[in-house]
């Protein structure tokens, strides 16, 4: 009987706290994640960026989307992106899932988060602010029927989370507006630690 009373009291506390704190808005949570990502600063490892590829895009929202990776010089690959939206988008979310290359395939790695794209660009998460340095992209919002280009972008390794293990990684980045998938990208890179630290 005592166990039942304790259980009933515990469930009452949970029900009361659920009513007092309604379910958070996913877009607000995405903004919180991009705020957390701005706190990342590391010099523990080096990031060898390889490429970004476009998997698919939704032609109801995008009239054009091209992603091209090329060598800026002998050692630095960079990405050029060209797009034209078919509708005005004030902001949308990115769902990022990491995969690590083991046993001759990319396997699920326990790193997954969702963030606001405009918030990530504004706070320069992973160096995204440099998208506005080359081309005619000036930031959010994303406007309808405006051909936009961002060029010579590469990730900033100092703005990544610390203590990620060495290895080859793939990030699958799914862009979502409300309940619709806009496009999916895959980014490939390697993480390594230098033998000699400076």
Language model regions located:
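N-terminal onset of structured domains
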Residues: 2-131, 135-136, 141-142, 146-150, ...
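Generic short beta-strand segments
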Residues: 154-156
